[in-house]
């Protein structure tokens, strides 16, 4: 749990730092995986983003072995998003002239995502993100948005653990 929790701090710091510089998610993941923990943390600090630096301040003076373990846990979580070409293409930062999907797209469009059973192991992390972000969007919809949204998940149990309890609590009936 220690490595996972602190690895998430590194990821959060990188996302805040580099997204604020205009980078896309895939570019951030590739940069993250392309650097050791020392190079990554030094580069984040060099950007002088105070919010990003708050997330990594706990690594100052920490054991190098523990910090490397945290980075490895984070690398394991991000590998799919930096190495799989189909995922990279789906999640890349869209050009301004390209259509893209956001949770708000669900207000006016039908979106179908089909993943064959044999690919669930590979794309499970992506499906968990899509599900969690959609649920978060549903729970924060403004009250004036009255149109009902039907959200169906086939084989929900095969997704594994989803962190959606908080979003479900906030959903309107």
Give the label of every model feature segment.
Residues 1-173:
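P-loop NTPase motor domains
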């Amino acid at each position: 749990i220690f490595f996972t929790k602190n690895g998430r701090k590194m990821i959060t710091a990188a996302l805040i730092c580099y997204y604020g510089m205009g980078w896309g998610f895939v570019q951030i993941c590739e940069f993250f995986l392309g650097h050791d923990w020392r190079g990554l943390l030094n580069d984040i600090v060099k950007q002088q983003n105070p919010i990003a630096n708050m997330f990594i301040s706990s690594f100052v003076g920490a054991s190098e072995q523990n910090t490397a373990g945290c980075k490895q846990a984070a690398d394991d979580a991000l590998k799919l998003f930096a190495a799989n070409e189909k995922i990279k293409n789906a999640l890349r930062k869209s050009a301004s002239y390209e259509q893209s999907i956001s949770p708000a797209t669900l207000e006016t469009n039908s979106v179908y995502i089909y993943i064959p059973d044999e690919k669930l192991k590979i794309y499970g992390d992506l499906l968990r993100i899509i599900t969690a972000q959609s649920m978060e969007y549903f729970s924060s919809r403004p009250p004036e948005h009255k149109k009902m949204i039907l959200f169906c998940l086939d084989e929900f149990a095969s997704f594994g653990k989803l962190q959606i309890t908080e979003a479900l609590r906030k959903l309107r009936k």
